[in-house]
Amino acid sequence: MNGKNLKEKSSIKYLPQRRKAVSLIGLGIASIPFLGVIEGIIWGKFDYRIRRKIIYFDDLPEEFDGYKVAQLSDIHMGSFNIEDYKKIERGIQMLNEENPDIFFFTGDSVNNYAEELKPWLPLLKKIKAKDGKISILGNHDYGIYAYGVDNVKKQQENINKIQEFHEEINWQLLKNESLQIKKEKSYINIIGVKNWGEGNFPKDGDLELASKNIKDGDFNILLSHDPSHFDAHVKTYYKKIHLTLSGHTHGMQFGVEIPGIAKWSPVKYRYPKWADLYKEKDRYLYVNRGFGYLGFSGRVGIWPEITIIELKKTV
């Protein structure tokens, strides 16, 4: 047998093994997205992350220098099972360990029905904040996806029940109104509006009504569920809104985030301001990625969020 024939037979012998190896590698690569989805369904939706921001303001009252704000949004308690209690409790414990001065919830307590909140009231009542717990409505809190957009009576009943539940856990629900947080002789205003969103979402948020007691020179924080409200009205509003806190987008519960390098989700094509901190001139918007989930029963790359913001006075 000459060398040429030996080489040909050797190639024939090992070619199927090479094909098998390449097939296995290809299968492994192809399975990565599938495994990512499985991971997101089993663990990702409970992989709570604390997102920290320090924001400086020239006109923050000195008494509020270092004031710590905690924010949750889009808890969607109707998506969870009671077997998830311990996992969700861990997220609440993470928030409480931050020892916030004030707690804000920026809408979407439920998916459709107020009653979805009821089993979770004892757990949500465990949230602690020294100066109070303030909440607003999101589009899902209206019940429009269950009762229809024209059934105003049922919507109002749903909202009233949600307000009762919020009161039961010591969350003060603001519906186009404001309140003051006082420290010594200084104060800041917390403004809360009903849902206002671009497109077919409810546009009940009335910034003029909600800020009627705000004076020139006041320091103002706005709670508004949908971040599209910021670009549509808030950033150019004649009364200065220093910081707006929103949610709504969930970061689509899918995307890629590499801190300091990349942040992408398909939701960016619907909401340009879809997650984290944005600034327009001297006004800030923070968009929380959501604590719960809706639709897809998981999170891939965009993890459930607990926001901690420290307000600082510029020296």
What are these regions (language model features)?
Residues 5-32:
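N-terminal secretory signal peptides and thylakoid transit peptides that target proteins
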Residues 51-56, 119-193, 199-202, 212, ...:
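Extended active-site neighborhood of metal-dependent phosphoesterases/phosphodiesterases
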Residues 67-154:
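Membrane-embedded segments
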Residues 72-73, 103-107, 133-139, 174-176, ...:
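Active-site neighborhood of phospho(di)ester-bond hydrolases with catalytic His/Asp-centered motifs
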